[in-house]
Amino acid sequence: MNDRLDLLPAPFDLEGHLAPYAAHAAQSRGRVHAEPPSTSRTEFQRDRDRIIHCTAFRRLEYKTQVFVNHEGDLFRTRLTHSLEVAQIARSIARSLRLNEDLVEAISLAHDLGHTPFGHAGQDALNDCMKPYGGFEHNLQSLLVVDRLEERYGGFDGLNLTFETREGILKHCSRNNAATLGDLGRRFLEGQQPSLEAQLANLADEVAYNNHDIDDGLRSGLITLEQLEGVPLWARHRREAEAAFPGVGGRRMINETIRRIINALIVDLIAGTRAAITGAAPQSIDDVRAAPPLVAFSEPMRDEARVLKRFLFDNLYRHYLVMRMAAKARRIIEDLFRVFLEDPRLLPPQYQARDPADQPRWIAHYIAGMTDRYAIKEHRRIFAVEVL
């Protein structure tokens, strides 16, 4: 059945401006399940639209980056983070004549498989799953779009294009890669993904480093005085003060962060252009055979590394964040253990027919939870007063 958008007039050429080494939707390696083409959207635009409308994408609104979801209304969630990544990635893709629609689809989908409670939840679930093959959130994101979403009558998942699925799978162990056919081959043969996938990866880094500064300052867990020891911050804070003397407080913080993001974007564009000029790829196949081409300059990489170390030492390892992480780990471990001991406590759709598959279905259930759902589920099972 054609979707309603196919009733619109055929679009003009949406990809004629792209570089020859960009990913072109008309040359996509296709979908697992063949579908008739749209007359109004490219294949990558269809991917993006499917991602936005899926259940897992809506759940990102209530999954955390650093702070547990109910800790404050202004802190980032996985949803706001994904939107920021997509905006940054599209801006850079436009400058480099790469495919904006593909890079947006990858950016919006890259965290679909993330657990509740951020990295603390991911680490806890991975520890629980170690005897059963482990848990990788990138692979879980792929499983969400390949199998777990239930939106279409003809197939499981979203049936996304190869290129979007490739970009979602940012990291993968060799053991898991060996089970993924063409999609896992690059991890076994040392090849690179598309430039759009490489770009989404670094746009993710630009976004989370800078919004973690913002959230850390809002929370009071890091201070402006501490940030003065970070060269990337100090330099752009001085520039902001010179441009707007007398302006302080939240406006100065926002202006400084804005300038840092801009500097990272400008540097990434320049570094990538230089790498592309040196490698001279003529097709996406040339990109796959080359070393990584989307890259910061060495000086910017060094400064970004100092910023990441600062955030690790002062924000992610702050005792209050560590307390939240300990609570999160306890919730994940308790839920996994009780469901493994008695799978009848699981919703029917997560009760495996084969007992050997049960741990993986428990992981699917827990990974799909939002922060507040995981807290409520833990309370329903373990809190006596709920009886």
Swiss-Prot record:
Source taxon at top rank: Bacteria
Which CDD domains did the record assign?
HDc
This protein's record includes keyword Hydrolase: yes
Q: Which residues form the HD domain?
A: 78-209
Q: Which UniProt keyword terms apply here? A: Hydrolase
Is the keyword Hydrolase in the record? yes
GO process terms (BP)? dGTP catabolic process
Quote one Gene Ontology molecular function term.
Answer: dGTPase activity
**What PANTHER family does the record tag this protein with?**
DEOXYGUANOSINETRIPHOSPHATE TRIPHOSPHOHYDROLASE-LIKE PROTEIN, DEOXYNUCLEOSIDE TRIPHOSPHATE TRIPHOSPHOHYDROLASE
Q: Which family does it belong to?
A: Belongs to the dGTPase family. Type 2 subfamily.
NCBIfam families given in the database record: dGTP_triPase (TIGR01353), PRK01286.1-1 (NF002326)
- The name under which this protein is listed is Deoxyguanosinetriphosphate triphosphohydrolase-like protein
Species per Swiss-Prot/TrEMBL record: Ralstonia nicotianae (strain ATCC BAA-1114 / GMI1000)
Q: Taxonomically, what lineage is the organism?
A: Bacteria, Pseudomonadati, Pseudomonadota, Betaproteobacteria, Burkholderiales
